[in-house]
Amino acid sequence: MPEGNGTVALAFSGGLDTTVCVSLLKEEYGYDEVIGVTVDVGQPDYEFEEAEETAEALGVEQHVVDATEEFADLCMEAVKANADYQGYPLGTALARPVIAKAILSVAEDEGCSAVAHGCTGKGNDQLRFESVWRDSDLDVIAPVRELGLTREWENEYAAEKGLPVEGGDGGRYSIDTNLWSRSIEGSELEDPSTIPADDIYKWTDNPSDKDAELVEVEFEDGVPVAVDGEELGGVELIEQLNKQAGAHGIGRTDMMEDRMLGLKVRENYEHPAATVLLTAHEALEGLVLTQEERQFKAQVDQEWSQKAYQGLVDAPLTGALEAFIDDTNERVTGTVTVKLEGGHCRPVSRESDYAVYSESAASFNEEDVSGGITQQDATGVAKYHGFQSRLANKILDDAKKGAAVTDGSGDHAASEDTEE
């Protein structure tokens, strides 16, 4: 452990974990001053109010950093990569490196000797924060992990010290909210057999009798730039689609998530805008990319998603993957209309000047295909298609028949026929 006698910048939410960390960083680690850093990546206003009230009650200097634009930019990179992990669009994972960088910047500006977080030793966030911080010369402190703290111990400690812990973590669930997603975990949801109550959802209404709605999303170079003809910045565009699609109950995920440390956890997510944008983007790619590009890009997208899940968005491999993603997305320019209905989002129309599509070639009402190719020219292809499989199956059948003769089963059958 460091000797202290300096200043430490703490990732500060005002919840139980970080409130307890403020006290422990002074008592157990010997730091003279703790600076609380709260980073805005699209959380609701009440979270900032609670963090401010808690910081004031603790006598902690608080810094609030607006990183919504940076986070929205990273979300757009995720759209270009069709990014998801086991069916969830990486909202929490994408936010952590953005938050970590903002905290590190404040720590360096304020002359801190260390940075700290309140993550447990069981989750992913400790790794995502520290992958950014350990690239600096500052000490990294993780009190909850290093001291083996439990929620029960933290509550008892907070009561003993008279720490203000009414806000933040006071509810039944652990909730994390940003522009791209809202996650809900803990309490009875830790039992995979428990059916979640409807009241855990805040962004998405129950998909019921609401009339279907068509939404048009316009892309330039793979990045969504307008909704229903209205040009919007990244933050505003995501916020609008969260409301618009959330009203139709779109973007709910209930999953068993495999964390980086090997633990399985039950997670519930809400991500209306992410669902719409990823669906629309993939539909447009299907129109403008060749078959080979789509097949290979699916592998690249999956690898990018893995690096993003790990919080390694600045890794050299991630940059190399993005070079391919950016190159293919230069043609992902056009408009996709999606239908929002009953909790589902599906593309119903797509247009682009870069469409790798010929209506006349694909039409059942036209004789010729294109470039002098006719339907009859497919006969040779049809004869060869599956030839290797047919040949392999024939050789296998012949080998089985030969084996039957060798082991005597074939001769026995023949003698029986003769006797009859």
Curated annotation (Swiss-Prot):
InterPro entries the UniProt entry points to: Arginosuc_syn_C, Arginosuc_syn_N, Arginosuc_synth, Arginosuc_synth_CS, Arginosuc_synth_type_1_subfam, AS_cat/multimer_dom_body, Rossmann-like_a/b/a_fold
Localisation: Cytoplasm
Gene Ontology CC, one term: cytoplasm
GO molecular function terms listed in the Swiss-Prot or TrEMBL record: argininosuccinate synthase activity; ATP binding
Reaction(s) catalysed (UniProt annotation): L-citrulline + L-aspartate + ATP = 2-(N(omega)-L-arginino)succinate + AMP + diphosphate + H(+)
The entry's keywords: Amino-acid biosynthesis, Arginine biosynthesis, ATP-binding, Cytoplasm, Ligase, Nucleotide-binding
Region Disordered, residue ranges: 401-420
Record: residues binding L-aspartate: 120, 124-125
Enzyme Commission number, as recorded: 6.3.4.5
Biased composition (Basic and acidic residues): 409-420
Principal place of residence: cytoplasm
Assembly behavior: Homotetramer.
Assigned protein family: Belongs to the argininosuccinate synthase family. Type 1 subfamily.
Name used for this protein in its record: Argininosuccinate synthase
Species this chain originates from: Haloarcula marismortui (strain ATCC 43049 / DSM 3752 / JCM 8966 / VKM B-1809)
